[in-house]
Amino acid sequence: MDYRQLQLFLATAERLNLSHAAEAMSITQPGLSKSMHRLQRELGTRLYHRRGRGIELTESGRALLRHVKLMETQLADARSEVMGIASGKLGHARIGAGPSWLSRHLPESIARVMGEHPNVHFTVDTGFPDRLIGRLRLGELDVVVGALPDNRVDPDLRFMRLSSDVIRVVGRKEHPFARKRERTLADYAAQRWILPGRQELVRQRLARAFMLAGLAEPILAVETDSLSLKLATLRMTDCLGLTTTQILTQEEAQGIIALDHEALQFRREAGIVSRRHAELSPSVKLVIAELRKIAVKYGPN
């Protein structure tokens, strides 16, 4: 395989049409077809099948596409970092952050780095870990800061624990539960909830707690990964939600209280996720160093 072959494959896989790919890459269609045949012969497998006027990637083709996209991203990162070093800049840090990290720890870390290195450029994407880690695997993010998965055995990822916290049931201070001392799991199951997507660990834990008690999954009112939307909606309705003890102490959670049940408290560990075989840029290393200092400052919880 050579780089030109992989570029041609990427153009073909993204367009799913040999004619369009050939035009985009300024090559004749017979020339592109010949290059793709040679690549498939070298790999010993078919990368695509013809379907009408287009093509459809095989499983091998989809696997190669993931790696070629990652390679292109890493080459762009290398180019940016080398140019940054040459110009005296430390480069670009692309960070994915979970909701509870956006209001204090991450901004404090970024501010510290900017104070010492004003030429660093940050891009921050927000959301829950499942989606962000997917982007990390594709090379679209350098690191993800947020909740760590229970299973941390992954050949492609590196995990660094920074803190732990407790996820609790919350609602507005006027919620009927605030005046009800005895609350059963069935009471909670009968409420309407604001929750993240089904793929998120915290929602799976909640569903499992109800299942073990022989109850149906919670009634979903709003599905969102936006902390601000969740808190605002909780203040205006009698819905329930889940958030960390740390969030409850912050100004943005004013008017929101814990409405605990012992079966619905979940310990969560949080930290930094990065690609195991990727070299982190100086700017990303600076942010990680500051996050570690802040984790020590505020303690393990």
Question: Where does each model-flagged region fall?
Answer:
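Hydrophobic hinge/microswitch elements
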Residues: F128-L141, A147, Q199-I257
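Short beta-strand-centered segments that line the small-molecule binding cleft or hinge
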Residues: T73, I85, E108-R112, P129-I167, ...
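A late-sequence structural motif
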Residues: H105, L259-N301
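A short LG(V/I)-centered, amphipathic sequence patch enriched
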Residues: Q40-R62
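Central regulatory/effector-binding core of bacterial HTH transcription factors
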Residues: L90-N151, A216, E223-T224
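Short helix-boundary/capping micro-motifs
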Residues: A11-G31
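Beta-alpha-beta core module
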Residues: V153-M160, D165, K180, S228-H277
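Secondary-structure junction motif
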Residues: A147, F177-R183, Q191-A213, L280-I288, ...
